[in-house]
Amino acid sequence: MTESDSDTVPTAGPIQDGPHQRLARMAGDWEGLYRLWFERDMLASESGQRGTLRAVLGGRFLLHEYTWEFDGRSYAGVALYGYHIDERRWECAWADSFHSGSSIMFSHTSGDADPAHFAVLGSYGDGQTPPGPRWGWRTEIEQADADHINITMTNISPDGEETRAVEVEYTRVRPVAGAA
């Protein structure tokens, strides 16, 4: 099997329609605006972000690799998005050289997910010794049209207070005509 064979969405079977086709439509090269908040309503940073989303493992998953900047330094991240057919839920594994340290955040929807709306919830520790209560982290992905994706990440305190943490506004990078 060639790499291209393994990265395409099948034309028959349980992943040819619905959520997996939704993921496949997001495949491509993207660039846009990255915004970061540490405190409610206090924008900490705004920079460019470049990312590539590509279908992997026969279209079962979407791999997102990206770079962004904060305070004059470059950072990178990777996420694997998928829809678990048997569990009827969205799932995500995410790591970022700024946000997650040496951990991988695993997130998923609880209960039956809306296959048309990617929204997952994970959690992380407070970094203290001894560990305190865990904080929630919700990731939502909206694709308004073929050329625009918005990714929103929300921080959720142990008390349930929600605060915007990250927003990415992507525009699809179209190949330049005549470029090799």
Predicted features along the sequence, with ranges:
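Hydrophobic small-molecule pocket/channel-lining residues, especially in calycin-type beta-barrels
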Residues: 1-180
